[in-house]
Amino acid sequence: MIRRVSTTSCLSATAFRSFTKWSFKSSQFHGESLDSSVSPLLIPGFHVFHCPDVVGIVAKLSDCIAAKGGNILGYDVFVPENKNVFYSRSEFIFDPVKWPRRQMDEDFQTIAQKFSALSSVVRVPSLDPKYKIALLLSKQDHCLVEMLHKWQDGKLPVDITCVISNHERAPNTHVMRFLQRHGISYHYLPTTDQNKIEEEILELVKGTDFLVLARYMQLLSGNFLKGYGKDVINIHHGLLPSFKGRNPVKQAFDAGVKLIGATTHFVTEELDSGPIIEQMVERVSHRDNLRSFVQKSEDLEKKCLMKAIKSYCELRVLPYGTQRTVVF
């Protein structure tokens, strides 16, 4: 159980440390994403922390932010039962003049060393470069179109470096015109069972921070994943761990399910088995046919993928063991 407490000012850390799992949100923000319009002088930042669990972690982190004039607006903590591990994510506002960006990194790094942290990441969206991503897809492009439109509207906090596909697209299509208009390169790399063109893909995605498989119907090899060395996020048109592999919508339809779903997960060497980031479902019935299953699935896929990417960029997603995630 997570204990949720409301506060309007900086943490009183010692009062909360007795809870093993708790979080709080400033009532002023109602749990929404932080906005730099709060003050012309204050800007938002995020910090995630993962370390062995000991007394005093929350106090040290909150004191660090308060000492620099920052104000914590949201703090989430997760401590699994019977495991000596601690996860946290804080949202705060601060004055970058009083707390320079480089100094912030140094301050949190000092705490990370003190607690032998496995991970300590800080992000200030208005000061840090946007995450650079590449998109991979096959024939179906509904997820790509959704991402491009959200990106154009400023609702996807990334820079799209390129789009890679194993299907050729005519130059006069909506997707190709959009990419050309925004200066995003499109690379057609046909694949076969014997040649997945992975070396060429690796060359194109150099310099990206993570990859998004927006319905890319090819299995990436272990060598590719090791060569890339960063996160790869996939949207699967089924509710994992059920209905893995090809045509999961048809599998679900034939099974007579009453809930259809979509799953966003990290890619691993095993097909459709990586840690799950986000899942969404919608009810179906005996009145649905395969065509309506597909339409509902595509709507879910777009929403599920967008939410997962947004959560990832806001440092809400942390690995938990080998097969699970913590999503704050």
From Swiss-Prot:
What is any one GO biological process for this UniProt entry?
tetrahydrofolate metabolic process
Listed GO cellular component terms?
mitochondrion
Give the range of the organelle targeting sequence: 1-12
Top enzyme class = hydrolase
Q: Which UniProt key words apply to this protein? A: Hydrolase, Mitochondrion, One-carbon metabolism, Photorespiration, Transferase, Transit peptide
When the coding gene is removed by deletion, what phenotypic consequences does the entry describe?
No visible phenotype. Puru1 and puru2 double mutant shows a 70-fold increase in Gly levels and accumulates elevated levels of 5- and 10-formyl THF. Embryo development arrests between heart and early bent cotyledon stages, and mature seeds are shriveled, accumulate low amounts of lipids, and fail to germinate. Puru1 and puru2 double mutant is only conditionally lethal and is rescued by growth under nonphotorespiratory conditions. Puru1, puru2 and fold1 triple mutant shows no photorespiratory phenotype.
* Chain ranges of the ACT domain: 46-129
Known tissue expression: Expressed in leaves, cotyledons, roots, seeds and flowers.
Q: Where is the active site?
A: D272
Listed under catalytic activity are: (6R)-10-formyltetrahydrofolate + H2O = (6S)-5,6,7,8-tetrahydrofolate + formate + H(+)
Q: Name one GO molecular function term.
A: transferase activity
Q: Is Cell membrane among this UniProt entry's keywords?
A: no
What's a Pfam family in this record? Formyl_trans_N
Q: Where exactly are the transmembrane stretches of this chain? A: none
For whether the record's keyword set contains Mitochondrion, the answer is yes
- What role is this protein assigned? Deformylase involved in photorespiration. Prevents excessive accumulation of 5-formyl tetrahydrofolate (THF), a potent inhibitor of the Gly decarboxylase/Ser hydroxymethyltransferase complex.
| NCBIfam families xref list | PRK06027.1
Q: Into which family does the record put it?
A: Belongs to the PurU family.
Q: What is this protein called?
A: Formyltetrahydrofolate deformylase 2, mitochondrial
Q: Which organism is it from?
A: Arabidopsis thaliana (Mouse-ear cress)
| Name of the coding gene | PURU2
